[in-house]
Amino acid sequence: MTLDPKIAARLKRNADGLVTAVVQERGSGDVLMVAWMNDEALARTLQTREATYYSRSRAEQWVKGATSGHTQHVHSVRLDCDGDAVLLTVDQVGGACHTGDHSCFDAAVLLEPDD
């Protein structure tokens, strides 16, 4: 799948050709995870509404939930003001984190709210 040239022109990729993808749960607003996307992963996500990312360690695309069943249906995708990150709003099925937790940010609180 090929990324729309108008979208591709707005992206500011890192040296590896990737942009940061921040994933937020629709409804709760929870930040679920942060991942990477190359042009092909973003194009596939936009065309199928299946969250697709790029694994730096495996050097390949992966569809969230293809193995685990913990899928992400993409409700919307937004580009940030600098063009170097996208925000995906998703409907999450199962845990978003590879540990099985709902969010990758469930593990350690470094600073508690000061309510």
From Swiss-Prot:
One Gene Ontology term from the biological process aspect of the record: L-histidine biosynthetic process
Superkingdom in the source lineage: Bacteria
Keyword Metal-binding: yes
Family the entry assigns: Belongs to the PRA-CH family.
Cofactor detail note: Binds 1 Mg(2+) ion per subunit. Binds 1 zinc ion per subunit.
EC top class named in words: hydrolase
GO MF annotation list: magnesium ion binding; phosphoribosyl-AMP cyclohydrolase activity; zinc ion binding
Organism annotation: Mycobacterium tuberculosis (strain ATCC 25177 / H37Ra)
Cellular component aspect of the GO annotation: cytoplasm
Catalytic activity: 1-(5-phospho-beta-D-ribosyl)-5'-AMP + H2O = 1-(5-phospho-beta-D-ribosyl)-5-[(5-phospho-beta-D-ribosylamino)methylideneamino]imidazole-4-carboxamide
Enzyme Commission code: 3.5.4.19
Alphabetical list of PANTHER family matching this protein: HISTIDINE BIOSYNTHESIS BIFUNCTIONAL PROTEIN, PHOSPHORIBOSYL-AMP CYCLOHYDROLASE
The protein's assembly and partners: Homodimer.
Cofactor(s) required for function per UniProt: Mg(2+); Zn(2+)
Pathway: Amino-acid biosynthesis; L-histidine biosynthesis; L-histidine from 5-phospho-alpha-D-ribose 1-diphosphate: step 3/9
Any Pfam family: PRA-CH
Binding site for Mg(2+): 80, 82, 84
Protein residues bound to Zn(2+): 81, 97, 104
Subcellular location: Cytoplasm
Keyword Metal-binding assigned: yes
Role played: Catalyzes the hydrolysis of the adenine ring of phosphoribosyl-AMP.
Protein's name in the database: Phosphoribosyl-AMP cyclohydrolase
UniProt keyword list: Amino-acid biosynthesis, Cytoplasm, Histidine biosynthesis, Hydrolase, Magnesium, Metal-binding, Zinc
